[in-house]
Amino acid sequence: MSEFNKDDYLNDLPDPSDAEAAAQASSGADASAESGSAQDSAAQAPSNEGADAAPAAAEGEKTGEGQSDSADTLTPLGKAKKEAADYLEALQRERAEFINYRNRTQKEQERFRQHGIIDVLTALLPALDDIDRIREHSEMDDSFKAVATKIDKAFEKFGVEKFGEKGEDFDPTKHDAILHKPDADAEKETVDTVVEAGYRIGDRVIRAARVVVASPQN
């Protein structure tokens, strides 16, 4: 067994200055590693933030468009346009109602007018029949003829038409046959004699003509 040498032991111990330098070197390496890791994290962070920011920006644009549309309806111009459209629609409805009312009123007025004429004509029918008989069976003096002509023109002015002529085809819608007379020469039913003239306004028959009908022999 070798003898313990104190001087050799002391020489083998590490120098305090060398140990301190080694410690400083180790600390610097660790700090460099941490700094590199931090820089890598910082480099990745903007990339992630950019990826997350894109959908958020798109969503913000959509939200902005919705807010813009909503805000447009609330602007004075948007309100004015809406009010103008409402007023136009109401005006068109009122105009249509007025036109319908005017048409109904005109029809009512024409109906009342015709009723008034019919009432007057009905009241004068006996006198008109007497005038026609005088014309047919006797000579009328000039003064009486002038009065009869004025009466006829007055009724024509109000749309009253006299009808019923000898020889015309018999029509049960406007002729009232008081007698059917067989006629060997007749090929169809015709008016042989007008007893009382008929009167109508337009297509409306006020009184059918009273006639004698010539009928074909069987």
Curated annotation (Swiss-Prot):
One of its GO terms (cellular component) is cytoplasm. It is found in: Cytoplasm. Signal peptide: none annotated. One of its GO terms (molecular function) is adenyl-nucleotide exchange factor activity. Keywords: Chaperone, Cytoplasm, Stress response. GO terms for biological process: protein folding. The keyword Lipoprotein does not apply. InterPro entries: GrpE, GrpE_coiled_coil, GrpE_head. Residues 1-78 are annotated as: Disordered. The keyword Cytoplasm applies. Residues 14-58 have a biased composition (Low complexity). SUPFAM superfamilies: Coiled-coil domain of nucleotide exchange factor GrpE, Head domain of nucleotide exchange factor GrpE. Participates actively in the response to hyperosmotic and heat shock by preventing the aggregation of stress-denatured proteins, in association with DnaK and GrpE. It is the nucleotide exchange factor for DnaK and may function as a thermosensor. Unfolded proteins bind initially to DnaJ; upon interaction with the DnaJ-bound protein, DnaK hydrolyzes its bound ATP, resulting in the formation of a stable complex. GrpE releases ADP from DnaK; ATP binding to DnaK triggers the release of the substrate protein, thus completing the reaction cycle. NCBIfam families: PRK14157.1 (NF010754). Belongs to the GrpE family. Homodimer. This is Protein GrpE. It comes from Bifidobacterium longum (strain NCC 2705). The gene is grpE.
